[in-house]
Amino acid sequence: MEKGECILYPCYFNAALSRAEGRRVPRNIAAKGPNANDVERALRRLGIACQAEEHHHPAHWARHEGRIIATYTGKKEALIKKVARAIEVRK
């Protein structure tokens, strides 16, 4: 991973998961069953360069949900919240 890159997994935005299971945003801005394409679309709408990969979250190795590498120089938590608000798939 290069400097200025953030790895985002769809589980960060999944309202069905608990914080212990990997969700990183509050439930009120989380999405229902987001996938890597939803995260990628949200990043592109925000004007953030990104690239999808066929990898999985280490804790969810059997799901093969993919991941997104975003080029972002700010804090990862700020990026995660921006993306969560931009994802169109909601509860």
Curated annotation (Swiss-Prot):
Cross-referenced InterPro entries: Signal_recog_particle_SRP19 (IPR002778), SRP19-like_sf (IPR036521), SRP19_arc-type (IPR022938)
Biological process according to GO: SRP-dependent cotranslational protein targeting to membrane, signal sequence recognition
Chief place where the protein resides: cytoplasm
Keyword Transport: no
GO cellular component: signal recognition particle
Keywords carried by this UniProt record: Cytoplasm, Ribonucleoprotein, RNA-binding, Signal recognition particle
One GO MF term: 7S RNA binding
First and last residue of the signal peptide: none
Regions annotated as coiled coil: none
Subcellular locations according to the entry: Cytoplasm
Protein family per UniProt: Belongs to the SRP19 family.
Function: Involved in targeting and insertion of nascent membrane proteins into the cytoplasmic membrane. Binds directly to 7S RNA and mediates binding of the 54 kDa subunit of the SRP.
Subunit note: Part of the signal recognition particle protein translocation system, which is composed of SRP and FtsY. Archaeal SRP consists of a 7S RNA molecule of 300 nucleotides and two protein subunits: SRP54 and SRP19.
Protein name: Signal recognition particle 19 kDa protein
Primary gene name: srp19
